Amino acid sequence: PLWGQSQDPLNEDQTTVRILEGDNSDPSIVRYGKSYYLVHSSFVYTPGLVVYKSDDLVNWVPCSTALTTFTGDIWAPDIVFHNKRFYIYFPTLNGKGKKTNMVTWADTPEGPWSTPVDLKIGGIDPEHVVGEDGKRYLLLSSGALYPLSDDGCSITGEPVRIYKEWEIPEEWDIEGVSMEGLNVKKVGEYYY
């Protein structure tokens, strides 16, 4: 389930509220007007990438489905609003074992959503980033920063590695070697 907190976490009287039932891992939220829109991993379920709407971050209702046909095993999507259009970037593992990242877009979060476009790059946890120059990029958990076309629907060049995966000692029993669940925001002159 996806959980929310209705009190200050340091307050002894805190209350935890379940806001969505089921497996809702890797949520991504965007605010548009007075409403919030959320997508989460949909894995192999079809329809996939259900878009939820909320005006209070507690009560959510489905408002559209970005994928109406099977696209593959989908996880860790990133929903963004840029230049008057909504985009969902997502990694997928198709039925033949190929990993790639795709994008679908719509003029409103209620859809209709476009047929997904294959960006032809592997990696997980895509994060849409806009540089100081207004150019668009897609950052992956490996630290690869790919330049995007102006419309955000194709990769236009080779990636720049902005950080490298961690060097893990061989004797450690660990699964991950890079950051996951990226969320990059610019505050002042720095990106966080």
Q: Language-model segments: which ranges?
A:
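Carbohydrate-active catalytic/glycan-binding domains of CAZyme proteins
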Residues: 2-192
